[in-house]
């Protein structure tokens, strides 16, 4: 009475006759009988009968559901007790229709049918036994639970996938945490999300990206997967001339993000590349890098302090790959599916000791060392605190356009600020980065008789990690993979193009928990909403691709690219 009934009665009084003030969900109280059935149950029902407004749904439709377990009376005795008292059922009993109406749920000792310890998977012969029980309970229209079962995330997801209705747990806070925000932990192409509506976002983005509107939950789905491009492997890993370099950076893209997208789509163009390495990506002043230090290391071949953009600890600018190729008379392109003043793209054209110094970084564009810049972020050009009419200054050298579609039509150097590139990837715009990549390649090829350099960033894989949003991560990965496919297609046509794919850091500590290789269903959880120091894959294709195998610091990538340009 003091442990359960009185607190529940108090709760109902405080919440206006329901268990939760702001929810229509009903509370179920399981009462386990340890002593003799009839006298114990008579005492329990007498106590509950004093509060019909709390325990009798005939009086209050929001009343607590009572389910009696343990020493349950024989089915023929169910009628001796008030109608609001329901009972735990036995899956092997053949109940009459009237008796079945008094069954609240079906409970089974897990150990009677399986010795699974919660690791790996249930062996098939035991799973068949469990599924037979589940099917019978559901055939009655009753929920089912297994007691005496193991605990843990693998168990929770396995039971969920099997259709088990109640998770029997001694760690409710852990179990509840696992199922919290469940729609953002699961993804399958062609399937509706488990939750719709609202926005999944994060407050962990930096100054230039903090206005990102987030991932629209009702759009975090794809009706079909993307095509996977199989390269011809023309000159792959050979000693041929490297004339062009396409450098693709998946911001926040770790191995788990790649694998999740691979299983969901049943293949990736990125994983068709045969030459692979691993890069270490620690910042100079911290174990875990930010995008400034990580992107700058990829751009310059030098280690950086966090927040520094292509600039030493002492404030000396480091030349980037863009400078290297520009000085060789080769056109340079910087393309991002995000803000052009964010850390990774600015590492390829700007210099600053503070990544948030957007005014200082974008002023570097006036040096004219980039032939093509494409991304979002018009406010960085129009809402300035330095008083510079940056668009006016840049128009002395560049065509300043507002749509990716306009890039190819312009003859000279182009800055394209297309605000649609600030949106999260979804079905309607999934090919946007790939389209921009194709247009950028065509533009630079027209200008570059000696060859060209193009950096392409998939920016929002990082945003999805900060938001702990697996559907967002997979869809952004597929958007990025389409851009990789465009680079590989051009490399096959051209024969003198090196393609390098990597990341600046991993975001979120994504761990894949379960999935289904046949259907493409993937389930994963994030251990953080920040960057992690995980080593990152490097993929290479084309002449010189074999130079990117092995394990090395991220600074080696830019150095090896430069070593291949004669």
Language model features: what each stretch is:
Residues 192-383, 389-405, 506-566:
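N-terminal catalytic scaffold of extracellular/periplasmic and nuclease hydrolases
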Residues 2-191:
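Catalytic cores of phosphodiester-bond hydrolases, prominently lipid phosphodiesterases
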Residues 28-36, 118-123, 133, 146, ...:
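Second-shell loop/turn segments in exported
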Residues 25-28, 60-65, 138-145, 162-164, ...:
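Loop/turn elements at helix/coil->beta-strand transitions in domains of secreted/extracellular proteins
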Residues 7-15, 87-91, 399-401, 429-446:
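A Trp-anchored, charged/polar loop motif used as the substrate-binding/catalytic surface
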Residues 343-349, 422-423, 448-451, 455-483:
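Active-site His/acidic residue clusters
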Residues 255, 480-517:
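Metal-dependent active-site segment of extracytoplasmic phospho-/sulfohydrolases and closely related
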Residues 147, 170, 248, 335, ...:
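Generic beta-strand/beta-sheet core signal
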């Amino acid at each position: 009475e003091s442990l359960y009934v009185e607190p529940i009665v108090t709760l109902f009084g405080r919440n206006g006759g329901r268990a939760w003030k702001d929810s229509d969900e009903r509370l179920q109280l399981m009462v386990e009988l340890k002593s003799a059935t009839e006298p114990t149950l008579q005492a329990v029902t007498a106590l509950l009968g004093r509060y019909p407004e709390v325990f009798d749904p005939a009086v209050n439709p929001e009343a607590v559901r009572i389910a009696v377990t343990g020493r349950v009376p024989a089915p023929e005795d169910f009628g001796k007790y008030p109608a609001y008292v329901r009972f735990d059922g036995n899956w092997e009993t053949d109940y009459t229709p009237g008796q079945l109406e008094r069954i609240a749920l079906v409970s089974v000792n897990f150990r009677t049918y399986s010795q699974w310890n919660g690791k790996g998977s249930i062996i098939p012969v035991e799973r068949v036994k469990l599924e037979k029980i589940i099917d019978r309970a559901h055939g009655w229209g009753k929920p089912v639970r297994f007691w005496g079962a193991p605990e843990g995330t693998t168990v929770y997801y396995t039971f969920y996938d099997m259709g088990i209705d109640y998770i029997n747990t001694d760690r409710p806070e852990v179990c509840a945490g696992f199922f919290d925000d469940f729609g953002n932990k699961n993804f399958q192409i062609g399937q509706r999300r488990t939750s719709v509506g609202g926005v999944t976002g994060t407050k962990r983005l930096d100054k230039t990206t903090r206005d990102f509107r987030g991932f629209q939950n009702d759009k975090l789905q794809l009706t079909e997967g993307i095509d996977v491009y199989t390269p011809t492997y023309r000159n792959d890993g050979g000693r041929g001339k490297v004339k062009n370099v396409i450098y693709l950076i998946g911001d926040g893209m770790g191995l788990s993000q790649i694998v999740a997208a691979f299983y969901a789509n049943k293949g990736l163009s990125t994983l068709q590349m045969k030459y692979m390495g691993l890069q270490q990506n620690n910042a100079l002043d911290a174990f875990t890098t930010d995008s400034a230090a990580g992107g700058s290391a990829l751009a310059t071949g030098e280690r950086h302090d966090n927040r520094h953009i292509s600039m030493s600890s002492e404030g000396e600018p480091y030349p980037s790959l863009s400078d290297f190729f520009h000085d060789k008379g080769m056109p340079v392109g910087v393309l991002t599916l995000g803000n052009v003043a964010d850390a990774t793209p600015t590492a390829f054209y700007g210099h600053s000791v503070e990544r948030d110094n957007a005014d200082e970084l974008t002023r570097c564009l006036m040096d004219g060392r980039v032939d093509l810049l494409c991304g979002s972020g018009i406010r960085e050009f129009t809402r300035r605190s330095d008083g510079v009419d940056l668009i006016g200054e840049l128009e002395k050298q560049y065509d300043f356009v507002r749509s990716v579609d306009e890039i190819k039509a312009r003859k000279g150097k182009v800055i394209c600020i297309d605000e649609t590139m600030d949106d999260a990837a979804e079905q309607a715009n999934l090919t946007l980065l790939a389209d921009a990549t194709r247009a950028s390649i065509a533009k630079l090829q027209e200008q570059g008789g000696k060859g060209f350099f193009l950096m392409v960033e998939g920016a929002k894989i990082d945003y999805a990690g900060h938001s702990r949003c697996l559907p967002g991560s997979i869809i952004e990965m597929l958007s990025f993979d389409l851009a990789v496919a465009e680079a590989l297609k051009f490399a096959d046509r051209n024969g003198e193009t090196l393609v390098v794919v990597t990341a600046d850091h991993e975001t979120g500590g994504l761990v894949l928990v379960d999935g289904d290789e046949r259907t493409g269903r993937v389930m994963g959880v994030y251990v953080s909403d920040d960057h992690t120091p995980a080593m990152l894959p490097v993929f290479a294709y084309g002449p010189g691709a074999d130079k990117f195998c092995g394990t090395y610091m991220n600074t080696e990538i830019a150095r090896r690219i430069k070593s291949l340009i004669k």
